[in-house]
């Protein structure tokens, strides 16, 4: 829990280039974690912004020519300055444009964390996926039958890229190729509002600013799931969204320790 306390104390600046659909919620979840968001995306300023930030997040949702240019500039700046960065592979399972771009970004910017659902992770690894738009396809969902083979694929992707891989879903799998963790927190409501995956990427960006990449990623993923569970009895999706941010802001270490469901593989 030292990472949480460090973030709250230091309030690191987090540069997050995301989509207009979820940008407000992403900024607020970063604030709730104790960090400071900046959402700059103009190609002429992003290098300067990234260079003074403590971490970078890039999100492939709702991409544009300018945003693609900006993310690559920021990613290279982060890599050159040893600033931790995470890429969210939104939609690479259904869009060749995004898939080709993600491969280029990973090759040239070497992100510390690659995050996506199982359809997106399979696509970036080069395996045919059954993505349903930006959502995971039914055939790609992790089951008891495909659990081991999916874990091995995630580990290989991590070793080949040098990145921590975070495969999110009903069960979350996070690996750096050597250590692999399975997190079973979360609730259905998290999939019933738009932007929770984007918010998680902002949270990962916040916690990896501590430079403890694997632990920061694990903490972010577990916290999102736990806060979802704490919020799931809300009246509806609107109040759930608000309670999710409230719980992220107020959750104690004791509750995290009590609620977390994590196993090593």
From Swiss-Prot:
Gene3D superfamilies: 3.40.1190.20. The keyword Magnesium applies. GO terms for biological process: thiamine biosynthetic process; thiamine diphosphate biosynthetic process. InterPro entries: Hyethyz_kinase (IPR000417), Ribokinase-like (IPR029056). Pathway: Cofactor biosynthesis; thiamine diphosphate biosynthesis; 4-methyl-5-(2-phosphoethyl)-thiazole from 5-(2-hydroxyethyl)-4-methylthiazole: step 1/1. Its cofactor is Mg(2+). Keywords: ATP-binding, Kinase, Magnesium, Metal-binding, Nucleotide-binding, Thiamine biosynthesis, Transferase. Transmembrane segments: none annotated. One of its GO terms (molecular function) is hydroxyethylthiazole kinase activity. It is an enzyme of class 2 (transferase). The keyword Flavoprotein does not apply. Substrate binds at residues 39, 195. It catalyses: 5-(2-hydroxyethyl)-4-methylthiazole + ATP = 4-methyl-5-(2-phosphooxyethyl)-thiazole + ADP + H(+). Its EC number is 2.7.1.50. Pfam families: HK (PF02110). NCBIfam families: PRK09355.1. Catalyzes the phosphorylation of the hydroxyl group of 4-methyl-5-beta-hydroxyethylthiazole (THZ). HAMAP family: Thz_kinase. Belongs to the Thz kinase family. This is Hydroxyethylthiazole kinase 2.
